[in-house]
């Protein structure tokens, strides 16, 4: 819950790399949750996890960041099905 008592959604992505801008995997389910919850969805990026005090980068509304051009999404195997699922 945030300071106003509203539910927030947090996805933690950790890496041994110190580079917070390094690409990471995000599942379709995680991406759909980010779309659904927008400003209440956060990605916590933990870098340099082998260090004594790994830094944590907090990103709110990753979908908004994409739309503003402040993030990018690489879709190497995106598949879409239109119409009714059988």
Give names to the regions the model predicted.
Residues 17-36:
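Mg2+/Mn2+-dependent nuclease catalytic core
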Residues 35-86:
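Domain-level recognition of nuclease-like catalytic cores that cleave nucleotide substrates
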Residues 1, 8-16:
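Conserved catalytic cores of phosphodiester-cleaving nucleases, focusing on short active-site segments
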Residues 12-14, 28, 48:
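Residues immediately flanking
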Residues 7, 21, 38-41:
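Active-site lining segments that contact anionic ligands and/or coordinate catalytic metals
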Residues 2-4, 50:
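Short acidic-glycine loop/turn motifs at beta-strand connectors
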């Amino acid at each position: 819950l945030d300071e106003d008592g509203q539910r927030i959604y947090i996805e933690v992505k950790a890496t041994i790399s110190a580079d917070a801008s390094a690409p990471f995997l995000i599942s379709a389910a995680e991406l759909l949750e980010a779309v659904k919850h927008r400003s209440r969805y956060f990605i916590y990026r933990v870098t340099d996890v082998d260090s004594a005090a790994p830094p944590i980068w907090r990103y709110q509304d990753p979908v908004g960041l994409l739309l503003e051009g402040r993030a990018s999404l690489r879709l190497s195997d995106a598949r879409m099905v239109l119409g009714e699922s059988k």
